[in-house]
C-alpha cells in the first residue's frame, strides 16, 4: 500500500492504520519518487487539493505507468463539491473525509480490496484493528483512551474466538506491518481463545480479553525509534522499554475507566511467580490469575513473532519454551494453554 501525503510529519497514525493490510510505504508529495517504489494494491492520497501545485503533483505521480490500474482512495480535508470534483478528476476510485473514524476507513478499504465480500473473521479483525489504532493513537497523544471503541474491539476479538479458528486470526495478524499493533492483536487473540478454551462465561472472557488488549498500552509512550529499531535494543533502550508497564498502569489508573484486573495486567504482565520479573518482583499469590494468563499469552506471542533480530519459533518449540520456564509461570495454566496453540492429543 502507498500513502501519498503533503504532511508526512503528521502521517504516523494513518500509516499505522493502513499497515493493517501489509507494508505501507509513505511518499512525500513534494519529494522525488524513490527508485525502489514497488507496485501497490492501493494508493491512498492525503493531500490538500485546494492548492493547484498539490493537484498537479498528485496527477503527475498517479500518471506513472505502474499506478495506472491501481485503485486510488482520496482523503479530503474539505468535503466541498469543488474538491470532490477535483478528486474524481484526478482518478480517485473512492473519496472519503480525512477525519473519518478508523473503523469506517478500514471498512471502505476492505470493500475496495475485497469487492466480492469479506469473511466474518475479516470483519472481526478489522473492527479490532480499528479500535487498537484509535487506542494507541490516543495514548501516544496523551488523550483519554476511547472506552467505547476499546469495548467494541474486545467484543470483536471474542466473536472471532467463538469461531475456534486461531490459525486464520494469526494469518491476518501477520499481514500487519506495525510490530506494536501486531503484538497487541496477537496477544489479545490468544487470550480470547484461552478464555474460550477454559469455558469462561462471557463477562470473564471480556475481562481477560480487555486485559490483553490493554497490557502494552504503555508502549505507546516509547519513542518509535526504539520500538521500530532493526536489531536488538541497547542497554539504555532496554531500560526505556522496561518502563512501559508502570507507564501503562499510571495511564489506566488515572483515567479510572477500566477494570482493576486490566489495570494490574498492564503493570504486572512481566512479573514471574518466582519473583524474578519486573517492575516490582512480585511472587506467587501476589500475581492475579488474569495477569498470569496474559503473561503466558504475551511470552508465547513474543516467541512466535518475527523480528529483524530473530526468527520466529514454530508453535511446538514456543510451547516447549513455556514449559521450560518451570516455576516462573503457572504450570496448571500452561498445561491448559496447550490446546489453544497445539490442537490434538498431547
Regions found by a protein language model. Give the residues of each.
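Non-catalytic interface/linker regions that flank or bridge core catalytic/transmembrane domains
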Residues: 1-173
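Phosphate/oxyanion-binding loops and surfaces in catalytic or ligand/nucleic-acid-binding neighborhoods
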Residues: 112-115, 340, 344
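Alpha-helical scaffolding flanking metal-ion-dependent phosphate/phosphodiester catalytic sites
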Residues: 187, 207-222, 233-335, 343-346
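Acidic/His-rich, divalent-metal-binding segments that scaffold phosphate/diphosphate chemistry
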Residues: 114-239, 250-253, 261
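Short gly/ser/thr-rich secondary-structure transition/capping motifs
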Residues: 25-27, 192, 276-278
Amino acid at each position: 500500500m502507498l500513502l501519498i501525503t503533503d504532511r508526512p510529519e503528521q502521517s504516523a497514525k494513518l500509516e499505522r492504520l493502513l499497515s493493517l493490510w501489509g507494508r505501507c510505504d509513505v511518499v512525500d508529495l513534494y519529494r522525488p519518487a524513490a527508485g525502489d517504489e514497488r507496485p501497490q494494491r492501493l494508493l491512498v492520497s492525503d493531500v490538500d487539493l485546494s492548492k493547484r501545485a498539490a493537484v498537479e503533483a498528485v496527477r503527475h505521480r498517479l500518471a506513472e505507468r505502474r499506478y495506472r490500474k491501481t485503485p486510488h482512495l482520496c482523503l479530503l480535508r474539505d468535503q466541498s463539491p469543488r474538491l470532490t470534483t477535483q478528486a474524481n478528476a484526478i482518478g480517485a476510485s473512492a473519496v472519503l473525509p480525512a477525519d473519518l473514524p478508523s473503523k469506517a476507513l478500514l471498512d471502505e478499504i476492505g470493500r475496495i480490496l475485497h469487492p466480492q465480500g469479506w469473511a466474518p473473521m475479516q470483519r472481526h479483525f478489522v473492527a479490532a484493528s480499528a479500535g487498537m489504532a484509535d487506542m494507541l493513537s490516543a495514548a501516544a497523544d496523551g488523550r483519554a483512551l476511547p472506552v467505547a471503541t476499546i469495548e467494541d474491539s474486545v467484543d470483536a476479538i471474542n466473536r472471532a474466538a467463538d469461531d475456534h479458528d486461531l490459525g486464520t486470526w494469526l494469518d491476518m495478524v501477520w499481514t500487519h506491518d506495525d510490530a506494536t499493533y501486531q503484538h497487541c492483536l496477537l496477544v489479545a487473540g490468544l487470550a480470547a481463545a484461552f478464555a474460550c478454551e477454559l469455558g469462561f462465561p462471557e463477562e470473564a472472557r471480556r475481562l481477560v480479553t480487555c486485559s490483553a488488549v490493554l497490557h502494552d498500552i504503555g508502549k505507546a509512550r516509547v519513542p518509535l525509534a526504539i520500538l521500530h529499531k532493526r536489531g536488538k535494543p541497547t542497554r539504555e533502550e532496554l531500560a526505556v522499554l522496561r518502563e512501559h508497564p508502570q507507564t501503562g498502569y499510571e495511564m489506566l489508573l488515572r483515567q479510572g475507566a477500566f477494570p482493576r484486573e486490566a489495570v494490574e495486567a498492564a503493570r504486572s504482565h512481566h512479573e514471574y511467580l518466582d519473583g524474578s520479573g519486573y517492575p516490582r518482583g512480585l511472587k506467587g499469590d501476589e500475581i492475579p490469575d488474569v495477569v498470569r494468563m496474559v503473561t503466558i499469552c504475551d511470552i508465547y506471542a513474543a516467541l512466535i513473532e518475527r523480528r529483524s533480530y530473530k526468527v520466529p519459533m514454530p508453535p511446538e518449540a514456543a510451547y516447549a519454551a513455556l514449559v521450560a520456564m518451570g516455576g516462573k509461570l503457572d504450570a496448571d495454566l500452561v498445561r491448559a494453554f496447550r490446546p489453544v496453540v497445539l490442537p490434538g492429543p498431547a
